[in-house]
Curated annotation (Swiss-Prot):
Belongs to the universal ribosomal protein uS11 family. GO terms for biological process: translation. The keyword Ribosomal protein applies. Located on the platform of the 30S subunit, it bridges several disparate RNA helices of the 16S rRNA. Forms part of the Shine-Dalgarno cleft in the 70S ribosome. Residues 115-134 are annotated as: Disordered. PANTHER family: 40S RIBOSOMAL PROTEIN S14/30S RIBOSOMAL PROTEIN S11. This is Small ribosomal subunit protein uS11. It comes from Mycoplasma mobile (strain ATCC 43663 / 163K / NCTC 11711). InterPro entries: Ribosomal_uS11, Ribosomal_uS11_bac-type, Ribosomal_uS11_CS, Ribosomal_uS11_sf. One of its GO terms (cellular component) is ribosome. NCBIfam families: PRK05309.1, uS11_bact. GO terms for molecular function: rRNA binding; structural constituent of ribosome. Residues 124-134 have a biased composition (Basic residues).
Length: 134
């Protein structure tokens, strides 16, 4: 009989990153928070879907705050103290995520909105029809 090989989880290398960048990508469906060093190498991330929310609950500001909390805890293990925040998207979890970073003791040096704005590019998607069901 062949011996089954079990894969062991790799040990996470602890980096000593004091200053970094917090990327908050907030869409209409989800909020993704990623922490990277100044060169852009991501070392901690989380999203509303990754912490267990599904469907319409992912787009709430509360879910964005919980996703930010999970990402900040991972980032603090690497020694993160201060960040530059880059906000992208038009979702409702953008401000909640930024406030949660500040509330968890990370110093925010700068807040920058990097939402891409088209200069009359491709045609936008059609509008969502909302009907009154009575």
């Amino acid at each position: 009989m062949a011996v089954k090989k079990t894969k062991s989880k790799q040990k996470v290398k602890r980096k000593n990153i004091v200053s970094g960048v917090a990327h908050i990508h907030s869409t209409h469906q989800n909020t993704i928070v990623a922490f990277s060093d100044e060169a852009g190498n991501v070392f901690a991330w989380s999203s509303a879907g990754a912490i267990g929310y599904k469907g319409t609950k992912k787009k709430t500001p509360y879910a964005a705050g919980l996703a930010t909390t999970a990402a900040v805890e991972k980032a603090k293990e690497h020694g993160l103290k201060e960040v530059r925040v880059e906000l992208k998207g038009t979702g409702s979890g953008k401000d909640a995520a930024r406030k949660q970073i500040e509330a968890l003791g990370i110093i925010i040096k700068e807040v920058k909105d990097v939402t891409p704005i088209p200069h009359n590019g491709t045609r936008p998607p059609k509008k969502v029809l909302k009907r009154d069901l009575k």
